Amino acid sequence: MDHFLHIDVNAAQAMMEQKQAHLVDIRDPQSFQLAHAKNAYHLTNQSMVQFMEQAEFDQPVLVMCYHGISSQGAAQYLVNQGFEEVYSVDGGFEAWHRANLPIEAS
């Protein structure tokens, strides 16, 4: 795969349930701590190496940001690092929350 793909929040949730996809949230620490999608990994510049050491490069990775814009750059970065199946979650956490999908809140 040379480029990331787009996925809507409902398809992302279904993929997490079916394929053991990794959901990574690239929002700022305060936003992530306040609320994030259930089982999301907070991917930052500081946690990138740890994520890459733990993740399987052939498992799907779903990238979430605020509204689905910033996640596109991060998704392409992960493709460039060798991840085989990477998706940008359209609408980001905003759409996830509006769809009443599972979240974890502080």
Swiss-Prot record:
- Major location (coarse): cytoplasm
Q: Organism's domain of life?
A: Bacteria
Q: Which SUPFAM superfamilies match?
A: Rhodanese/Cell cycle control phosphatase (SSF52821)
Question: What top-level class of enzyme does the UniProt entry assign?
Answer: transferase
Q: Which residues form the active site?
A: 65
What this protein catalyses is: thiosulfate + hydrogen cyanide = thiocyanate + sulfite + 2 H(+); thiosulfate + [thioredoxin]-dithiol = [thioredoxin]-disulfide + hydrogen sulfide + sulfite + 2 H(+)
GO BP annotations, alphabetical order = glycerol metabolic process
Enzyme Commission designation: 2.8.1.1
* Listed CDD domains: GlpE_ST
Q: Would you tell me the Gene Ontology cellular component terms?
A: cytoplasm
- According to the entry, every stretch annotated as the Rhodanese domain falls at 17-105
Compartment(s) where it occurs, according to its Swiss-Prot or TrEMBL record: Cytoplasm
Which terms in the Gene Ontology molecular function aspect does this entry carry? thiosulfate-cyanide sulfurtransferase activity
Mind listing the UniProt keywords for this protein, alphabetically?
Cytoplasm, Transferase
Pfam families to which the protein is assigned, alphabetical = Rhodanese
Q: What does this protein do?
A: Transferase that catalyzes the transfer of sulfur from thiosulfate to thiophilic acceptors such as cyanide or dithiols. May function in a CysM-independent thiosulfate assimilation pathway by catalyzing the conversion of thiosulfate to sulfite, which can then be used for L-cysteine biosynthesis.
The record's similarity note reads: Belongs to the GlpE family.
Name of the protein: Thiosulfate sulfurtransferase GlpE
Annotated organism of origin: Vibrio cholerae serotype O1 (strain ATCC 39315 / El Tor Inaba N16961)
Protein encoded by which gene: glpE
